[in-house]
A protein has these predicted regions:
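Conserved PLP-enzyme active-site core in the AAT-like
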Residues: 2-143
């Protein structure tokens, strides 16, 4: 899809061998599994020496702040935040919650890139994640 291609382009443009990609909201869309290398794929980030880790949300849908703190390392270069629930049962993330998460992450590692997959986000609020600290926002195109 166009969104997956935009996400892949943003990831591959900002990550280098030895870098780590972190998802603090659990597993991404299945279309990204091959891009990241969760499912082996030719040309994946994993094939280029980029590692991936994720921190699942807590059972009540809240962020696992302790888990996120422990998952941020020196080589964590980019944090990807999927706004839409996708195929999960969690609620869609509000811009306010995304802002709280980005603030928490940037307080730990100010130079990390926070990228938001804003799929369907334009239908629910009048603010965008860029207004609350996101460095990159994806919605079928890169902003």
């Amino acid at each position: 899809t166009c969104g997956t291609h935009a996400l892949a382009l943003a990831l591959m443009s900002n990550l280098r061998p030895g870098d780590e990609l972190l998802s603090p909201v659990g597993k991404p869309y299945d279309t990204l599994e091959e891009v990241i290398g969760i499912r082996p794929s030719r040309g994946s980030l994993a094939e280029y020496g980029i590692t991936y880790s994720q921190v699942d949300l807590l059972p009540d849908g809240s962020f696992d702040y302790d888990g996120i703190r422990n998952a941020i390392h020196e080589n964590t270069r980019l944090v990807t935040i999927q706004r839409s629930k996708g195929y999960q049962t969690r609620p869609t993330l509000s811009v306010e919650r995304i802002g709280e998460l980005i603030t928490f992450i940037k307080n730990i590692k100010p130079d990390v890139i926070c990228m938001v997959d804003n799929c369907y986000g334009e239908f629910v609020e009048d603010r965008e994640p860029l207004a609350v600290g996101a460095d990159i926002m994806i919605w079928e195109e890169i902003l």
